[in-house]
Amino acid sequence: MIGAPFCIQNFEKEQRGGRIMAKTKTITIECPKCREAFEIKGYDTINASLDEALKEKLIKTELFRHTCPACGEDISAPYSLKYQDMEKEYMVILDMGDIDTAAMAEEVLEMFPNYRIRIVKDVMDLLEKIHIFESNLNDKIITYLDHKIYEDVSAKLRAENSPIALDKVLFGSFEFQKKKVVFGALNNAGKQIFIDTPFADYKALANSPRLAPCFKEKEGEYAIDKAWAEALA
């Protein structure tokens, strides 16, 4: 069950020597079952380079799981945060609708002018960005493939009159030895659907005369998502 964070207080943050040292913030959420409000500990920034344990809690989505102290309801309560990787020099901003992303991106670039910045609106999209960058792939190419695979598989399912409908397609893994990129398709049936794409397709897009310029970093282009991919199609 999803709870709604509605108040953030007691927030502290400091920046030292090219790194963000984050302290906790207190977030007040309301239990969707009993409507009791209670406080949880949250983070403004997760520095994956400095705190592997916290990174793993995020990857497993344990960071957003809480139990209502009043009724015992298990609650998923995502909140806005930043994810930093100092080695790969990028920052992903998770915006749950309560932050000024433009100002935040500007602040990040003032401290880290060489960073790639991405803005996402969903925890699954945040995790996808992390997996893409850890695989040393271009997230713009992968996001474009997400969209193309979604469209192609959805059209095939409709042609077969299948009751299965896709919700979204996300990057799963890059299998270097097998030269393939694996995608997973979230769907209304809860089935595990995986799609293998030859790495040659990724490289062909990277070298496409029409699309290659679109896959380069551009100032102010931080929301690399479905809408961005649709505009290229």
Model-flagged regions — what are they?
Residues 2, 16-17, 183, 219:
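Feature targets compositionally biased, intrinsically disordered low-complexity regions
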Residues 22-24, 224-233:
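Short acidic DE-rich linear segments
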